């Protein structure tokens, strides 16, 4: 056998352990900040590989979407609505997010659908005053009239069309006359759904009317000033709001406080 052809002699030792490197030693943690419309500003942390060479850490964070329950954002028990927040800017160790969509949990939607009633849905594309194109989906259900003996509460086709038209008109009116911040303020207590429910009573009584889904189809050109304004940091008291973990409590249209037993 020729010299140098024996591969067994040139092979290294079997079972040599590789040095295990913890991947988290090359990563940094960033705080995720929600806009000032929500009561809880600090919604969590996210991890990213730290800046090395041409790969910048902030570029890996921009565009990340975080899905958070409204219960965590408002510190209450309404947990069936989920808000999507997208990271648009990184300042220091803070990821500043903006509204990117809303959805209802599957279990809540399934629990609404019942027998002996009519399900009515509507969808509409509408533009806000600051240039966001939103696709909004609404859902509602008929209910029995007061003192009704009949078990079923089925609406006629003409009534369904009239209710759907009313849904589209109210959503268009509420969104097209407001900016994104005001629209989110209406989505938090679901005041648009309550308005639709009241307006449709003359056509057919409704219940469980909700904006079940919101998609952001188009966004205007990114403006850092607008984003800072959403986070309450554009005004003169910027130093106080950056460290504040809670948003500002505001009176919202369509919100009714619970009845108190004692004064």
UniProtKB/Swiss-Prot annotation:
Record-linked Pfam families: Ribosomal_S3Ae
Classification via PROSITE patterns: RIBOSOMAL_S3AE (PS01191)
GO biological process: translation
GO cellular component: cytosol; cytosolic small ribosomal subunit
Highest rank taxon of the organism: Eukaryota
Ranges of Low complexity composition bias in the record: 235-245
The keyword Ribonucleoprotein appears for this protein: yes
Gene Ontology molecular function terms on file: structural constituent of ribosome
Keywords: Cytoplasm, Ribonucleoprotein, Ribosomal protein
InterPro entries per record: Ribosomal_eS1, Ribosomal_eS1_CS, Ribosomal_eS1_euk
Basic and acidic residues composition-biased segments: 246-255
Location(s), subcellular: Cytoplasm
Region spans: Disordered: 233-263
Record family assignment: Belongs to the eukaryotic ribosomal protein eS1 family.
Subunit structure: Component of the small ribosomal subunit. Mature ribosomes consist of a small (40S) and a large (60S) subunit. The 40S subunit contains about 33 different proteins and 1 molecule of RNA (18S). The 60S subunit contains about 49 different proteins and 3 molecules of RNA (28S, 5.8S and 5S).
HAMAP family, per database record: Ribosomal_eS1_euk (MF_03122)
Protein name: Small ribosomal subunit protein eS1
Organism annotation: Nematostella vectensis
């Amino acid at each position: 056998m020729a010299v140098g052809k024996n591969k067994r002699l040139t092979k290294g030792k079997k079972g040599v352990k590789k040095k295990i490197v913890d991947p988290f030693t090359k990563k940094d943690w960033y705080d995720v900040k929600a806009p000032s419309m929500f009561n809880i500003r600090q919604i969590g942390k996210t991890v990213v590989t730290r800046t090395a060479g041409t790969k910048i850490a902030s570029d890996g964070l921009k565009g990340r979407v975080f899905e958070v329950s409204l219960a965590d954002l408002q510190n209450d028990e309404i947990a069936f609505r989920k808000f999507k927040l997208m990271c648009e800017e990184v300042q220091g160790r803070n990821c500043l997010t903006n509204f990117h969509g809303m959805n209802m949990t599957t279990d809540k939607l399934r629990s609404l659908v019942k027998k002996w009633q009519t399900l009515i849905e509507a969808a509409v594309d509408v533009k806000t005053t600051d240039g966001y194109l939103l696709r909004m989906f609404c859902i509602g259900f008929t209910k029995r009239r007061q003192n009704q003996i009949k078990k079923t509460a089925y609406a006629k086709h003409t009534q369904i069309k009239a209710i759907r038209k009313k849904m589209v008109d109210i959503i268009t009116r509420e969104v097209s006359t407001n900016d994104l911040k005001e629209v989110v303020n209406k989505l938090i207590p679901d005041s648009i759904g309550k308005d639709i429910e009241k307006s449709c009573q003359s056509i057919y009584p409704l219940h469980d009317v909700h904006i079940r889904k919101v998609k952001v189809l188009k966004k205007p050109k990114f403006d850092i000033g607008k984003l800072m304004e959403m986070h309450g940091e554009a005004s003169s008291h910027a130093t106080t709001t950056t460290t504040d973990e809670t948003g500002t409590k505001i009176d919202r249209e369509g919100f009714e406080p619970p009845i108190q037993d004692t004064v």
